[in-house]
Amino acid sequence: MGITRNLILGLACLAFVSIAKALPHEPELGSARVVFQTSYGDIEFGFYPTVAPKTVDHIFKLVRLGGYNTNHFFRVDKGFVAQVADVASGRSAPMNEEQRKEAEKKIVGEFSDVKHVRGTLSMGRYDDPNSAQSSFSMLLGNAPHLDRQYAVFGKVTKGDETLSKLEEVPTRREGIFVMPTERITILSTYYYDTKMESCEEERSVLKRRLQASFVEVERQRMKCFP
């Protein structure tokens, strides 16, 4: 009886371990966050620097250069993708030389086992696997047929309600693309570091504690040494 029970428990543990190994692990997000302020609301996203380091460096540099300001989502296919246009052709404002130089770079395809699910950020490209430049998609649903074919480099961290609003925009079909009938503009962008925010919060808490301690010391001093 005891042997049978132990055998069953052992098999159950092995099965659990096998399932755990089979389940995909979500990669760790870096501390950088980017916010796209669109005509339909804000979308915040983070990066997977250990999954697609070259892609992350390139996209984040374009953000820091202001490359995505005045760009737009040229494609919105409900339940599939909302795709940002290439910086070189999608902006309504002219580019400076530094922006243009970075936008025209081609990035090697960094394909991984990270799944294409809602909120995933995935690079656009042509047939050449190393032809990605600055266009990328925010997934609006699961798309397993894109797995290991397109480079995943991050995910949306806030603003899913904005993605839902984009899905309700009227669209028209042009060939394989489903495109919005109005321009969905990225009005402006900004970025911040979650580690720095955490440090600022800790400093603020410490400052309040020190101020409270000072008040208490002063109160005791006045009480004991009037």
From Swiss-Prot:
Its EC number is 5.2.1.8. Residues 34-191 form the PPIase cyclophilin-type domain. Its main location: endoplasmic reticulum. GO terms for cellular component: endoplasmic reticulum; endosome; Golgi apparatus; trans-Golgi network. It comes from the Eukaryota. SUPFAM superfamilies: Cyclophilin-like. It catalyses: [protein]-peptidylproline (omega=180) = [protein]-peptidylproline (omega=0). It is found in: Endoplasmic reticulum. The keyword Glycoprotein does not apply. This is Peptidyl-prolyl cis-trans isomerase CYP23.
